[in-house]
Amino acid sequence: MSRLFERTAKGLVGQEQYRDIPHRSGSTDMGDVSQIMPSLHPYMGGAQGPGHAATFAIVDKQLGYVLPAKALAAMVVDLLADGAAGAREIVAKSKPPMTRAGYLTFQRSMARREVFDGASGG
């Protein structure tokens, strides 16, 4: 999927404007999704400031909103063309680290309920 996104993005913004971003720290729900199925969390420009900060702002609406939507729509077309051949190939080659059942078992094993009784100090 990353190669498909790269090809699509380069077609939209040009080779000279495309660049790979190295792995970034942080956590997203896409990390969870990627444990059970092929996934992609692409970034496109148009924003300034740290993510989730009060100073984060979209400064280029074309690059921040329109081009990402076009890229994703173009990828959907490519993935579903020819009877979804592209999507089927990605799924066939995918080797997710967990099954759905394994993921749910893991998540349920991590769940717990804690009650803090501030009145008792403990």
Regions found by a protein language model. Name each.
Residues 121-122:
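Preference for extracellular/luminal or secreted protein segments
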Residues 1-15:
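Metal-dependent peptidase/peptidase-like ectodomains
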Residues 18-75, 79-118:
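Zn-dependent metallopeptidase/amidohydrolase metal-coordination segment
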